[in-house]
Amino acid sequence: MSQLSKQIAKICLSCSETNLSISHSLPYIRYSLTTIVKNLLQWSGNSVTEYTSLSHEPLPDIQEVFQSIQSDHQAYKASVTRQISIDLPPDVEETTFKNETKIWFLKTADYGDNEDRMLQYPDGEFTQLLKDITRYHQIFQQGYDKIILIRPPTYIGYDIQLTAAMQCLGYTKEQFQFIIVQPLKLYAFHKPTQQLHPIPDIAPAELLKAVSMDALRWYSLRVPLTEVAPINISTAGKPTPQDSLHRLQSAYLRCCTLLQQAQQQGIIQLETNGGGGEISPTEIAAKLMSLADYVWESPDAATLANLLQAVPKILEQSAAEIAPHLLCRHLEAISETSLPWLDSLSLNPQNYALLLAAKQTIFELLQNVLAIGLPESTFPDPNLRFVKFSED
């Protein structure tokens, strides 16, 4: 979890804030939880600016952008789109449509749209599409490497149009990412049939009575944002062995307990680095890489060490693909490996170093990146370092 790229990417993130408490539509609930994408991008070493801080700037000269599009032959003036005229006589513009007002169209169909899109209405007014691409073009001209738009399902369709329009301006899909967040799908356990059944959407206030905010966030993020996220309200976040969030939190709490017991018994000595607060991504990355210096006595320990060392790469991939589910699944793998290892670890320096690394990694990723709470512990300080191991 270091600054993973040699060159820091400058990113503009547009994720309209939606207050969960006033959102009355289930599709917006999951969307409202995607604000953690900013954490994800920053922890992977990017410089992130929210679109709201840029949207108040004066819109540049739309006419100038419009003329640039025309000079690049990405637009044309006609009565109908190319998709319609293909089935008409070649001279239809000079004959049937000769007295019709001509309209400017952008060649978005060349980039995956199902038809070309209008840029200017017959009365001369510019369309919202042209206004939008002008604004985003302006942001790129200010030195941004990437623009990421995250929107609820109501924007389905416009994502294809806008992405294609930006490609007409020469920007790739990697530079301009438009992500539609799919909704949650609720399920509940039906006792009479002993089966899981889908249930109708319920209001956010009612949902939060059944599922904690932490569980709601976890199950919203552990599935790709572009896929519907199933959530079983009967078990989500409940203290059961089947719940993945509970297992992860249990692994963290077990790490805390073992470290605290070892310190109280004088087996190990830990000290705070000072300064408090979060550890920097660079510091954690260095600690994780140091695990490669040890020889592990058990397969579980070796697997856990490898999983922890892979965190910087997973974090980088998760940020690049706007895929927090990759981070969630990696955390699940860490917890699944940790739990059996924690029950059988022997008292030696490398195991306690691994224990501390696992605890700190879970803390930083779950709480500081994914904004999901952890169980209370009397040993919560994440800013610790291993000082001494006593063999007495």
Q: Could you tell me what each predicted segment is?
A:
Residues M1-D392:
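Non-catalytic interaction-recognition regions
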